[in-house]
Design a protein with these regions (language model features):
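Cullin-RING E3 adaptor/co-adaptor recruitment helices
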Residues: 206, 217, 222-225, 230-297
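Start-of-repeat signature of ankyrin repeats
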Residues: 16, 49, 95, 109, ...
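Acidic/polar low-complexity surface segments
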Residues: 59, 92-104, 141-145
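Ankyrin repeat A-helix N-terminal signature
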Residues: 22-27, 55-74, 103-107, 115-121, ...
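Ankyrin repeat boundary signal
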Residues: 42-45, 88-92, 104, 135-139, ...
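Ankyrin-repeat and related helical/solenoid repeat scaffolds used for protein-protein interactions
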Residues: 171, 176-184, 188-230
């Protein structure tokens, strides 16, 4: 007997996950297309209140082993849902996909953008941002709104990346690109951290504490505040990392912007004589700007 995708999806929204949720979880664009062509609402919530786009992007959390997240098929599934009108900001106030665990209450929860940031795929982050996903919102913990802890796409994405690498200097290229895209989209680099053990550390301070050297200049260029050392909050590891030679150079220079400006001037002095006979003089600063990570080292 043939199964009606629309009827199956409507039943699943009440009784539990079947084809629609599985198609979203696995990023199966063709299966999703069949449901949508049959008239299923693109923002139909599952029993836990998640929309297909949230599920496809991993807003429920890091995908378990066995799920292939970084695939062209998943990108196609996300693009399909957005093309059919899925809310890129599902999970936020006045949007579908809010937490419905508590009777009579709708609470903000992880958005598709947060899910893509956690799972570390820059392509899906870019697709969502182009579709209107907001990088700025910070939401309270839906399971404990009084805790005072908040979440943002930049925060959860960097936290996930730095924890995967144990603070290694070489954060993977996807996570670096994600952070850069979110900062350019207006994400707050000084937002509170998501980890309770971190106390009142901002994201900038948390990145220093865990030792994420590669993302420090990215956050600083985006307006990250470099707190004085020692921080006087009992985080001995933070104080150790805060004394890193790179950060000490910024202190001596008077801050990142001053250091960046001096770095630019040094490189211009070196390269201007070499390029002025090849290109107009006014283009040399642009070449330096796009060829080097000014202030990053």
């Amino acid at each position: 007997m043939d199964v009606d995708p629309a009827a199956e999806a409507e039943t699943e929204a009440v009784e539990g996950p079947t084809g629609l949720v599985l198609a979203a979880e696995h990023g199966d664009a063709e299966a999703l297309r069949r449901y949508l062509d049959a008239g299923v609402s693109v923002d139909l919530e599952d029993p836990d209140g998640w929309t297909p786009l949230q599920i496809a992007c991993g807003a429920e959390g890091v995908f378990p082993p066995g799920f292939t997240y970084h695939t062209e098929e998943r990108v196609a599934a996300v693009a399909l849902l957005l093309d059919r009108g899925a809310s890129p900001n599902a999970g936020l106030p006045n949007e579908p996909g809010q937490c419905s665990t508590y009777p009579g209450q709708r609470r903000s929860r992880f958005t598709p953008l947060m899910g893509a940031a956690i799972n570390g795929t820059s392509v899906i982050v870019d697709v969502l941002l182009r579709a209107g996903a907001d990088a700025k919102p910070q939401i309270k913990n839906p399971h404990d709104p009084t805790s005072g802890y908040t979440f943002s796409a930049l925060q959860v994405g960097l936290s996930s990346a730095l924890q995967r690498t144990d603070g290694a200097e070489t954060v993977d290229s996807h996570s670096y690109a994600i952070a850069n895209a979110l900062i350019n989209a207006g994400a707050d680099v000084n937002c509170p951290t998501m980890n309770r053990a971190d106390g009142n550390l901002t994201l900038m301070q948390w990145a220093i504490w865990i030792g994420g050297r590669r993302v420090w200049p990215l956050l600083l260029r985006g307006g990250g505040v470099l707190s004085p050392n020692p921080f006087q909050n009992g985080f001995d590891v933070y104080d150790t990392h805060r004394a890193h030679p790179y950060l000490r150079k910024l202190d001596d220079a008077g801050g990142f912007k001053v250091y960046e400006k001096a770095h630019r001037a040094t490189l211009l002095a070196i390269f201007a004589p070499k390029f002025t006979h090849l290109v107009p003089p006014e283009l040399v600063p642009l070449i330096v700007e796009f060829s080097f990570h000014l202030g990053f080292y």
